[in-house]
Amino acid sequence: MKNRILLVSLFGDVNTDHNYRVDNIYKAFQEFDRFIVTADFNHATKQYKPLSQSDNIHFIHVPAYQKNLSIKRIYSHIVFAIKLYNYLCGLDILPQMIYCAMPASLTAFYCGRFCKRRKIKFVVDIIDLWPDSLFPISRKYRLLKPLVFPWTYITNKAYSMADYISAESKKYAEVALRKSKTTKWSYTYLGVDIEEMNRLVLSSKVPNRTDDNEIWICYGGSLGNSYDFDSILEAVKFIDSEGIKYRFFFVSEGECRFEIEKYIQQHQLNAEITGRMPYNDYLKYLSRCDIAINSFKPTTKVVYSYKFNDYVGLKLFVLNNLRGETADMVNEYSIGRNFDEKNLSKILFEVCYNWETFKLWKENSIKLIEEKLNSDLIYTKLALHILSEFNL
């Protein structure tokens, strides 16, 4: 009988067109009996998922929520964690390993406690640093930080129970290792599958670009509270005033849409918000552009993002303000320029004004993908490392 591996991911899914990390993990362990547990609610679309009829996937029903920062969302995550623990306790056949994506913290805590009691190998995969990553959003939420000490305790306890720590960046792994210093660990970036991205772009019905007289610039992903849209809008306003021929696309949807639309209309910018769309259309929209902006609020804890991954895979010139590993990649491979909240306007203008030179940098993404972001290679390496540590 094959070894059994259970993957737990509150947000992820498998067998979809999206580049979900859990799907890549699922494929990497193809030599084993694999099962996944996830929520039936889609965090991105704020709708319930179409449930697939697969014996390998178990969906846990959770309450819906519409705002990313809300009591309803916290309640939904708590319900998932409790139902997950009950599901684990009811398993007839136990897995040899449980691989749990973080966030959410309580989910990993219950998985860890179950694994310790049943002597099952426990792996945490840190995709975001909760609750710390939620507090830089505004002063109001930072004031709540002392009130969520139990949340921090649960997160750290989950780290300490892990037999192996995986993370989407070296920094995330190092944070967890402060609570579990002797645990084996590694980090694996989100990864890019060029062939799959090209297939999805070709499957889209979004029209091809026909106008090359303008520089097309984009921001892809959620219009949420974690991102620095003020700097983006000010930069677009500046290049507009300087006579740059451009079009700007917010290929996205989210809570900040109203404020962004108001600014665009007030200053009569050549910009638009596309709204939410299927992933293949999202990629096609991005692929038509020249420059992509990866802009988070200055106090963010994020090190590496899905949107950056998509930008690189589509060979866009990247303007980035994430520090650490993402900034290092931008510099090392010359795939774009780094900026901060004070100089985006200047840098965007410089890039647009000298676009005939800078557009050649787009091809540098290929080397970055080959050396650090090739999905097939990096996830296979991760799986082999974990299996060798556990002798599975």
Where do the protein language model's features map onto the residues?
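N-terminal subdomain of nucleotide-sugar transferases
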Residues: M1-H61, V236-S241
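Conserved donor-binding/catalytic core segment of Leloir-type glycosyltransferases
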Residues: L6, N208-Y227, I232-K237, F249, ...
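Nucleotide-sugar-dependent
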Residues: T16, Y227, P278-Y285, D290-V312, ...
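Donor nucleotide-sugar binding/catalytic pocket of nucleotide-sugar-dependent glycosyltransferases
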Residues: T38, K145-S203, A271-I273
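Membrane-proximal helix-turn-helix segments that form the acceptor-binding/catalytic region
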Residues: C89, L106-F109, R113-R117, D132, ...
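Nucleotide-activated donor-binding/catalytic signature segment of Leloir-type glycosyltransferases, i.e.
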Residues: F249, F258-L283
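A charged, aromatic-enriched C-terminal amphipathic alpha-helix characteristic of glycosyltransferases
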Residues: K342-N343, L348, Y353-S388
